């Protein structure tokens, strides 16, 4: 035969078998099949083709051609991404059918070279196996087979030496190949898979094609975004076609016996459908209308039936629903307080939270004490005293009592409360550890306290309140069993079945057909009531019953039919949140055995999918299933099916029959961790997708998933069938292998019927008992190199990037790390085997580990640590946190509840116990739970139920008798505010006056209600609301019509903004992050004086926000000068000067501005807060900067016409720059601002885990914009790959970039113009009764009567532009010393204009005529006469005019009057010595010298009195050729430049430090050819060499250095 003939024959054979081999190529023999009779012939054809190509083909490596002509064993390479980026090319492996003994003796290809790793000690590059103490035989767990890499290697290589296999990663990104150890090398290590064969446990059935190839590490085929593991979505789902789930429905008749064996594993009642046996008359059952007989041996389960050899009768009571608590309620009852919190419990009081640092650096503060409202005669003024900041509150209380000794009864206990609130300060706290103290000092106020009786506040309500049970919110379930409907349907079924049997006995064909249809209709109605689920066995038994031909068959099938109905009802009740169930036919008690004795494999069947959504039916043609096992977020094993499944309409409603079977042979049952979860996902092929172009890569998308624990809440392994709702995936699919048991929640959710194997025993996971203690080792006993390397790993604090060798090293040295609290996450992340035998060792080291800081313990609440004892240990550490930490972390605690496996958990107990600390915690926990109940009831019902049950448990067990009433009144207040807002929005055509009138009318009704029953505000429950200040309330001008409400209290008012149809969870989260950043800064001694305010979401898209008083937006400030104000750089500084009329107040406001502006620059940059414009940046009159409106964050930038409006890292404008520097030239204040920014930024970088853990916990909260991508965004913004010095350089450059950007100004202008167009009449409208340069009105009574005023002279000032000011002397009656004020001619004009407007008949005039330029000396000289005449005429008017409030306001002293030399050149007061900040660092390992050039100050002016343009040069002398010259950038026009640049010298041996000198010089860049040296200093590098070397091999010399002036 010629070569052409052989090739032609091969092609023809390939064409004949191409369709049959498509599945083989995509599955690659990975599917367990029951062979058909044609299998030998098919194999012969395959071998024939192989022989032909082996004889003529040059080899697979050089093969090219189409698939139709390819060899039968050739597989095309599908370049489809797996779970994240894979750096190496891959192809799907060929899987050979070998058991573990065969695989163990097979040479394996070596692993790809690992990525570069940091240097580590040589002796630990291939660490030896750790020594492990022998375990008791009872706890011995056979080692599992290794978990190989997720993708195989295609190239072949010689065998490699045997080394311990690295641990399996918790992420799907490991690339290590498996290796197998000999028996002599066996060891028991929890971080290494067991590398031995298990012939005794492997299924050695003759059907070798049914084995799952575990030589290839399982790649999870869910292709979903799994939080905390994957870093990017996998866009390819084509790998689902390469499956290995067994499709039982695809077998031919010859394999029916094998199918029956599999089905019996899941259903002991299974009867083969191919059995020819017929029921005998002796085994017949009584008529259906009797319903009485002895019960069957075991309840039926959906999916099969057990062969019954005796008569069965069903009592009528077996089909009646009975009341019974569901499993969730039983778990909730077990929640209890564990006494974890070692603090005083005061559940009847509001106690202010305290911090573990001092809120101020002051040593003493002024405290003013008042008597609270409870005293009958409370007319005494407050009494002041000076208290030390570190003094205890009980001592201060005693001092306060001594001030009121004669006025107070002595038989009561007293305490100090926050002024105006019913919130006591903790008696054992320090004055400086109370946040209220810092709040008062932040606003420049005295610390005002109320003295009151420390006793529960008894509240009397005048109206009768409704029952709590009628008021409390309940999650509405659309699929909870309706008892009446089900029982009525069953009654109809019994009637129709009786009619059918009568027709059957009569033999009437017409009646039989009619009654048969009615029975089907009733069953269809029953299935429709129960979520549209139609179990296949139920439908088949109904068909058999209606197709019976003999009486014996009728009786037999009737009872089978009823058994299936009973099983269906019982299972549905268990799978919904129902308080009903159906009594079992018989209670069967199985013996209980520990899972440690079970060497079997886990077996699961996927039966079918029901309640198919309409869009699935219309948009998808085929469906594929994936079945994975998870421990936390670590994949243990998995299967997927390659055979497409389609929607069938043969059973009442559309369904997807699956009939898929999986047997997990990677691990034995005894080796699965306690927290193992089963995750099932479904994907679909899009209809009419372009599959012709790529037949092997159709458009497949993931549609939904469900997750269920392997063990129930009592730690018994699940058995039998389950109804599981599939969570529909949204636009951004996310698989969550954690959380509560999924209950059926919505009639629209598809339902999966999944079955576990039914065992003869109840299998439970035993309690882990520590029978021995570990002995901690001294960290100092390790060699220095290992210590340094471990400390570096701990300092990095990144558990997700640990290399294999790092994991080995950390686990081996775990006993040396017990005194390093920060190392515990690294140790636990290095452990990959969490089976029974290995968790004992983890629990041993937990007992000896150093106490964790609460910030570290937060990480263990993440789902990647599912072990219940690990989480309980974390809760114990959290309980040691300060009350302020616990209070502000309540949202994270409640979010972490969604990661708990069961309702009863240590975290749930901890939250319950927190609610009893004080009423502050009680109300905060209640409303945090409430908002999640409302938001999650639709998309995450199990979590919503969990929150609601905990909420109910807290309310029922709380000791405060008025709690339920208080909460009910809060709900009523919120409903009333919602009603008012809806009323205003419904009248969109009303004018502003009409809208305000309607608001005040409704608020008047609310005010009367509050007078009867005072309400605790949800946002501030310690505030007793007694009414509303109606005249101060208003409506904000936006589409949602948010309300500004000012509530009246006993001693103070409380202002809020109430919003509806606006998700305020984003704003609340940003404020939480801001509070955490502020806590980090203050605990490190950096107080940036940040203004924080409360945001409280109280339900679905509604909430309250605290209003900050005495503030204005930047737009409101700019509007004072009209549209041109947005272009005025001085507008903000003038506004601050106007509101701070003395020098001390202005300097304090300027300091507040510098600090808070630096803080908000950091916050907005790190969190990526966008949509920044001049209407959401605010300034208080005390100088604090703060932002509002956080709808755009985490890189979600505001867009306009397709362009990004936010072009800068953060908003830092020239207006802010002018406030900081008192003008346009950089000063020392600018250096201070930059230092604050860089210090704050580096503090956050060092505490990154505190921030990132909060983000990780909230990543699954469904808050818009918060996900794992936002975590990556924050980590990227923190520049974690840079050193502190490099980060300082980068952030300084960003400050300059933001300041120099023109886009911010353009954005402000565009927003201002838009506001001007929408509100033109009221835009920049000035108050005619006030002067623009004085914020308040002053009168004769406040300032004293003016007797005479005299214009003395005029002076030229720079503010900062040139202006002529008139100095006026003011004499007041009975005041010996006159005062001086400085006013411009424009201000005299403003006074004249407003006086004429108020008094039209006034005859006083002011000559304002000037020719051309008015701001010149000659014109100022002429105007002084006009001004003097104006003042003479003014004070000759009647008192009503000359002594009105406008006149006294004009002559009131302001800032420029108190400090007339504010704008005089500062050079006169400057030191003559120039200084420069340097940081010189030498690294002896890298042999590098780094010179960081920071600031320079006190540079001299140039000869022409101009500001210099400095830059810095450095040399390492001696250097005759100046080859070592390096220089910084030029800083223009300043005597106080900031460089913040790092200059580096490489290849710098340590030996030459002794002979070298660092020369640093400051130069002025006068032009291209005009440059001269201004200052110079020389630093011998010997000083650096003499310094001690740090742990990182660095010697550092830093500080301010004096420079010598060059002549």
Swiss-Prot record:
Domain (PI3K/PI4K catalytic) ranges: 1029-1303
GO BP term (any one): nematode larval development
GO cellular component, one term: cytoplasm
Reactions catalysed according to its record: a 1,2-diacyl-sn-glycero-3-phospho-(1D-myo-inositol) + ATP = a 1,2-diacyl-sn-glycero-3-phospho-(1D-myo-inositol-3-phosphate) + ADP + H(+)
Region (Disordered): 54-91, 105-128, 142-182
InterPro entries in alphabetical order: ARM-type_fold, C2_dom, C2_domain_sf, Kinase-like_dom_sf, PI3/4_kinase_cat_dom, PI3/4_kinase_cat_sf, PI3/4_kinase_CS, PI3K-type_C2_dom
GO molecular-function terms, A-Z: 1-phosphatidylinositol-3-kinase activity; 1-phosphatidylinositol-4-phosphate 3-kinase activity; phosphatidylinositol binding
The PX domain, residue ranges: 1344-1458
Main location: other
EC number: 2.7.1.137
The protein's name: Phosphatidylinositol 3-kinase piki-1
